[in-house]
Amino acid sequence: MWLGVDYYPEQWAPSMLEEDLDNIQKLGCNAIRIAEFGWHIMEPAEGRFDFSFFDHVIRRAKARGLRIVMGTPTATIPAWLAKKHPDILSEFEDGTKRTFGGRHVYCFNSKEMYTYAGRIVRAMAEHYKDEPAIIAWQIDNELGHEDSDICYCAQCREAFRAYLREKFGGDIQALNDTYGTTFWSQSYNDFDEIPLPTRTITTHNPALRLDWERFRSESIVRFAAFQTTLLKEIIPDAVVMHDFPGGGLGKHVDYSALSRHLDFAAYNNYPVWGGQREPLSPNEIAFGLDYIRGLKQQNFWITEAIMGAQGHDITGFSPRPNQAKMWAYQSMARGCTSIFFFRYRGATKGAEQFCYGVLDADNVKRRKFYEVQSFFREIKNYAHPLETPIRSQVAIVYDYDSLAAFRIQRQSVLLD
């Protein structure tokens, strides 16, 4: 059982590292999760790789018996990459580019993204392939989250046409017959005539839109598989996982298909986010946990468990004393075998300032610290039974194509 925190030492003065790791150890942790947003630190300029920062963090963590979950940093591309290859940025439906500064702003069909992501992942794997402290690799971060699962750029248009060309064996008439394009004079003479299903009068052909949903999913799954393959080519025994966000059934990506390329699934469990005035109900939280367990039909990790209020620019409900601890227990009861709290300490600047941590930004140990400490102390006693699989008596069957089809054509106001 791995018990830990998500630690971002790059946000803090180097002089704080030793005290941080001492306190993380006192908290009851045996692992830390690092590096998932550290691309610029590891490659400050194109081709100039420098792993010294995280080497030092790992070395000092190992001295305290802490193990490492290492994240590939592809969720946040560096500024120099966006400047050199602006086409790497994804596009909104109206054709405007997503600008550098957020996260997941890249296009999943960008050849440049594959090139540069491949370089940093390969360099990381080569550098850390003999590091025994690394217990797992996390590829990217929350793939498909926050509308990053949709892009309408020229690269996606050409890739979508290639996808359809392959699906229909280059036979455009087969596509016409399948889609029923003869109505509304939608018939195509060539795959290069096929548009992206952006805004139009009324709506696009539903079969075209369904294939677009399938294509969007495949684009993200392919990118995840690319990273897993790279890691395992260099580190054959690497344990590879991904931290899935909530709301998986509403994404433009089939997380069950993505999970086939992982050794196990992990989940970022947020009963509260942003301006929510109340947390999710216990049954909604349970559904999310069961969904993650069902992705590979096996136990899972929680890579982000909250301990304070959360949000990018606004917060709502703040967990009451022992409420976040209760959510952590609920996770363990539904198949979680290792858990990491997001995050060790809240930030004083930069993105996610309102994502509060185990410690607040003033670095003072208060109720939240001792709440996590007590949870870790208690849950260790159940490490062995929590490793056993959960055998459900009831199943909920879902299908990505069916969910997408209902998004496209709701059919009736009675089907809600």
Language-model regions, residue ranges each:
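Short, acidic/polar
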Residues: 11-26, 117-123, 246-258, 320-329
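Conserved, mostly hydrophobic/aromatic
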Residues: 5, 24, 32, 61, ...
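Polysaccharide-binding and catalytic clefts of secreted carbohydrate-active enzymes
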Residues: 94-264, 268-284
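Short, well-ordered coil/turn segments that N-cap beta-strands
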Residues: 1, 28-30, 62-68, 130-135, ...
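Aromatic-lined substrate-binding rim segments of carbohydrate-active enzymes
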Residues: 18-98, 122-125, 226-235
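The substrate-binding groove and active-site-proximal loops of carbohydrate-active enzymes
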Residues: 2-14, 35-54, 99-118, 143-149, ...
